[in-house]
């Protein structure tokens, strides 16, 4: 990756001299009682949550470096942020106050030259995940990467390979993977209580940002404290526009984000992939509304077909719904008003799983009353007592020389499945056959979307070819 010291010296650095870049042959050995030195890349919005949670507010581990292209304290918040999102929209200014001893950077490349960093969190726009995480892994640093793991299928495959080669401890930020309700769901589905699964529906109320829109004309002044060129990163340059890309609204743009499916799919499709032990899909087709050239559609239903497993009644159909699209009407009564969740249709009954909290609900409820009151209640109590925390799973794994539970051997294939669907959304109405071993569709235009182009000067060797 090419960058100049003359440009990089503008980066705010509040922590001594920089060490020369070098490739670690192995990760640093740590004792189980060590305090990790963690660096956070992207500290606004969800990055604020990740930084605090992974360090337990600085009590368990050290935040030694803060990196963000936006050095303001929260900056300009888009008007479409909900109350919860708005409360999280704290940026580098707030991070500096919480961790006053941490070095502060705009450019992750300079930050990663420090020898004292054990691990990093990556909570940036999707298009930068792979470049940052791969660079860190090749330097022997453990990585926690927010979902989606990467923006493209090819990046997911490479991330998995680099993780295996370097031996670092990895975790994708699909926090639901550690929750009681998702863990219970795995046991329920594999128990056979509702028979083998014939069909799955997964849905979200997202997007809460704009999709299905054209690129606006014009530009706005770049705010003081924002390094717009670094935010663009691997993408092709374009003018800054207030409330259009940074912050938050980048999710709807194909150049920077992955739409509602990319944002929520690694959460909500996870229980199906996990519990049913699904491999790669073999085909996908999307029906969409609100199509635009550069953004994801306003609403979609994506139909995946998976090969049979021991837990499915033959080949499995999985449907993803977003933008207000919902499950078929005959199931509307049992899914209720859950804004995000999944429905498993079995041979003997159905399971509804709300995303985020609660417990799996089995239907017809009267037929599964004894199971719900005894076995399921016991499972819930067992997992609740463990108090599993997704962030601590990762940090404990680093200290104990183990792997986390959403490590890249699991998370990368899950992310590939999600990104197969985002490609279908961009080519609506086409039945696409997917061959995971060779990273190719039976459609040239779709296959071209498996990889992305990287701006000159931002290429890294691992992602070439």
Enumerate the language-model features and the residues they cover.
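Contiguous beta-strand/loop segments that form the cofactor/metal-binding neighborhood of enzyme cores
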Residues: 184, 196, 201-205, 210-409, ...
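Redox-cofactor-proximal catalytic regions of oxidoreductases
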Residues: 58, 177-178, 240
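Residue-level signal for alpha-helix termini/capping positions
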Residues: 113-116, 137-138, 164, 190, ...
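Extracytoplasmic/secreted proteins, especially bacterial periplasmic and envelope-associated proteins
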Residues: 49, 86, 90, 107-110, ...
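N-terminal glycine-/serine-/threonine-rich beta1-alpha1-beta2 phosphate-ribose binding loop
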Residues: 1-142, 157-169, 465
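Short, solvent-exposed turn/loop segments enriched in Gly/Ser/Thr/Pro and often Arg
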Residues: 70-73, 105, 123-129, 149-151, ...
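A contiguous active-site-proximal alpha/beta segment in oxidoreductase catalytic domains
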Residues: 142-144, 149-225
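Structural recognition of the beta-strand scaffold that forms the well-ordered cores
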Residues: 37-41, 63-68, 121-122, 144-145, ...
């Amino acid at each position: 990756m090419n960058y100049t010291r003359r440009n990089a010296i503008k980066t705010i650095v509040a922590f001594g001299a920089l060490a020369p870049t070098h490739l670690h042959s192995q990760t640093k050995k740590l004792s189980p009682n060590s305090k990790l030195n963690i660096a956070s890349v992207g500290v606004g919005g969800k990055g604020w949550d990740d930084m605090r949670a992974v360090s337990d507010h600085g009590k368990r581990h050290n935040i030694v470096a803060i990196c963000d292209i936006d050095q303001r304290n929260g900056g300009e918040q888009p008007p479409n942020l909900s109350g919860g999102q708005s409360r999280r929209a704290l940026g580098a200014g707030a991070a500096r106050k919480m961790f006053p001893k941490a070095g502060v950077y705009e450019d992750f490349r300079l930050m990663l030259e420090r020898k004292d960093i054990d691990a990093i969190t990556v909570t940036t726009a999707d298009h930068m995940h792979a470049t940052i995480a791969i660079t860190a892994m090749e330097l022997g640093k453990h990585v926690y990467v927010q979902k989606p793991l990467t923006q493209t299928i090819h990046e997911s495959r490479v991330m998995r390979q680099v993780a295996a080669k370097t031996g670092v401890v990895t975790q994708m930020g699909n926090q639901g993977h550690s929750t009681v309700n998702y863990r219970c769901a795995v046991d329920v589905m594999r128990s056979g209580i509702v028979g083998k699964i014939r069909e799955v529906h997964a849905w979200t109320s997202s997007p809460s940002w704009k999709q299905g829109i054209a690129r606006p004309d014009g530009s706005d002044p770049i705010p003081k404290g924002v390094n717009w060129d670094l935010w663009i990163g691997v993408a092709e340059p374009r003018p800054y526009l207030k409330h259009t890309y940074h912050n938050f609204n980048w999710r709807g743009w194909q150049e920077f984000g992955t739409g509602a499916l990319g944002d929520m799919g690694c959460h909500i499709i996870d229980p199906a992939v996990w519990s049913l032990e699904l491999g790669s899909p073999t085909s996908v087709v999307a029906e969409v509304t609100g199509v635009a050239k550069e953004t994801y559609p306003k609403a979609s239903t994506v139909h995946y077909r998976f090969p049979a497993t021991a837990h499915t009644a033959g080949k499995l159909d999985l449907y993803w719904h977003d933008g207000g699209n919902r499950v078929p009407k005959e199931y509307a009564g049992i899914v209720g008003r859950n804004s995000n969740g999944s429905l498993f249709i079995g041979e003997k009954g159905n399971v509804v799983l709300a995303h985020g909290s609660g417990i799996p609900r089995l239907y017809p409820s009267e037929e599964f009353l004894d199971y719900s009151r005894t076995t399921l209640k016991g499972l819930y109590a067992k997992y609740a007592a463990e108090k599993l925390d997704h962030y601590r799973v990762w940090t404990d794994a680093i200290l104990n020389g183990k792997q986390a539970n959403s490590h890249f051997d699991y998370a990368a294939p899950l992310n590939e499945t999600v990104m197969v669907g985002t490609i279908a959304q961009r080519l609506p109405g086409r039945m696409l056959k997917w061959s995971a071993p060779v990273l190719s569709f039976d459609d040239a235009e779709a296959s071209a979307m498996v990889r992305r182009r990287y701006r000159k000067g931002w290429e890294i060797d691992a992602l070439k070819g």
